[in-house]
């Protein structure tokens, strides 16, 4: 079995849904989560995230981290 991975794109999609539902800009999301705009961009691009930033964004969404962890069998 392949090691689990964090699904950054799924996190970004949830952030965007929450942002739109609350009528917020991405700058508002950055302020609310305490992460930089660059971190939000990396999330959108599926890049690597620092654990603190990732946890801050997940906490803002009110979801468990496990919601974004993907486990898949090795090919």
Model features per residue range: what roles?
Residues 34, 45, 73-74:
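Short amphipathic alpha-helical surface patches that mediate protein-protein
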Residues 22-42:
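Short alpha-helical DNA-recognition segment
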Residues 42, 46-59:
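Short, basic-rich loop-to-helix N-cap that marks the start of a DNA-contacting helix
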Residues 25, 50-53, 64:
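Residues that mark the N-terminal boundary/hinge immediately upstream of a DNA-recognition element
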Residues 1-24, 28:
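A short, Lys/Arg-rich alpha-helix, primarily the initiator
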Residues 62-75:
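Short C-terminal boundary/hinge segments that cap the last helix of small helical domains
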